[in-house]
Amino acid sequence: MKNNKYHSHSRRKTPWDEEEEVSDVASFVRDEYRSHYFYHHRPLSETGDSKLLNKFIPQSCPYCHGKKYKRNGHTTYGLQKYKCIDCKRNFTITTGTIFQDHKLSISEWIEYLLNLFGYSSINLNSRINKNSETTSKYWLAKIFMLLSDYQKDIILSDCVMIDETYYSVIKSDIITKDKKKLRGLSKNKYCIGIGCDDQCLYCKLEGKAKTSDTKTVQAFKEHIRPYSHLIHDDEKSHHVLVQALHLKSESYKSTYLSELNDKDNPLDKINHYCDLLKKFLNAHLGFNREELQGYLNLFSFMLNPPHNKLEKVEILLKFALNYRKTMTFRGYYMKNPY
């Protein structure tokens, strides 16, 4: 019997699957829906996956990292197999990557990414691709894993802007006092530090509640080039960063900024990024807040160069085939049963 603990509703089902006689209209709707479903779930032998993947040459054995190996036949869908001379184990170009043992085609993954870059929610993406929500969430977790170190080397320079934006904890985690929500920038909100220059965007989860000297320095110190020009809103903790990195400070009081139109606001650019980030997070309403930094890494990747979505897909696909770390469906949901 199939264990449905980690599986959600199948997109394959229609209301007429068990009925022997249906109306002409129902029959047409069912057949068109099934046609669309099976187009998105073609066997790998009918896709171009193997043709693409066979153009990639392994750098080493994914098991022992030996450099000597030989060709050793093909999989049932035409993917080149190799055998390591040292450890004698068989492998393919996808062994040890997020595509290991994949059942859905890479073209499906491409469409998923394009939808995701267009601010589609997990639910909407699963409907478009005719996948279960658990599958879509699992794919997103794989993307988070790929992008886990994406922002590590981002260094903002020259004219830099920074700000903080806040995002609420999930309803079940809200802290109350005398049955009332805590006021202001309390532990009921996550603090997100955002910085940008003329080229790049950087986003870092600082923790809960209002920012502080320590949080600001930890978030930005390694990601802003010393002696840069910093434009900010005169948040007290920013001045510690200014001193630490010898920045040229251009600050504005919040009361002054609140009276300006967007076009006259010197922080309009960073404010726009804050608004876009909240729009992006709201598209994934109810998401697991433990994955918040994963969403921030993805958001940064989406808004940073290159700006063409197809070029972003190319970058992720190449990286995925060289990133030797995998994740199983069951392993993910045992750790994140949401």
What are these regions (language model features)?
Residues 1-338:
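Residue-level recognition of single "structural anchor" positions
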